[in-house]
């Protein structure tokens, strides 16, 4: 079973980018509420 590197990278980006985006918004919201 071969692992398609491009598919792996695409999947990782598809998961990490929205997660990082949400984390940034979350941190900014917490900072503003203080």
From Swiss-Prot:
Record localization: Plastid, Chloroplast thylakoid membrane
Output the GO biological process annotations, alphabetical, semicolon-separated: photosynthesis, light reaction
Q: Which UniProt keywords apply?
A: Chloroplast, Membrane, Photosynthesis, Photosystem II, Plastid, Reaction center, Thylakoid, Transmembrane, Transmembrane helix
Matching InterPro entries, A to Z? PSII_PsbM, PSII_PsbM_sf
Is the keyword Membrane in the record? yes
What parts of the sequence cross the membrane?
A: 5-25
User: Domain of life of the organism in this record?
Assistant: Eukaryota
Q: Describe its membrane topology.
A: Single-pass membrane protein
Tell me the protein family, please.
Belongs to the PsbM family.
Q: How does this protein assemble? A: PSII is composed of 1 copy each of membrane proteins PsbA, PsbB, PsbC, PsbD, PsbE, PsbF, PsbH, PsbI, PsbJ, PsbK, PsbL, PsbM, PsbT, PsbX, PsbY, PsbZ, Psb30/Ycf12, at least 3 peripheral proteins of the oxygen-evolving complex and a large number of cofactors. It forms dimeric complexes.
Report the PANTHER family cross-referenced here: PHOTOSYSTEM II REACTION CENTER PROTEIN M (PTHR35774:SF1)
What this protein is called in its record is Photosystem II reaction center protein M
């Amino acid at each position: 079973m071969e692992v398609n590197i491009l598919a792996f990278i695409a999947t990782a980006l598809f998961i990490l980018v929205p997660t990082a985006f949400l984390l940034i918004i979350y941190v900014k919201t917490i900072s503003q509420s203080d």
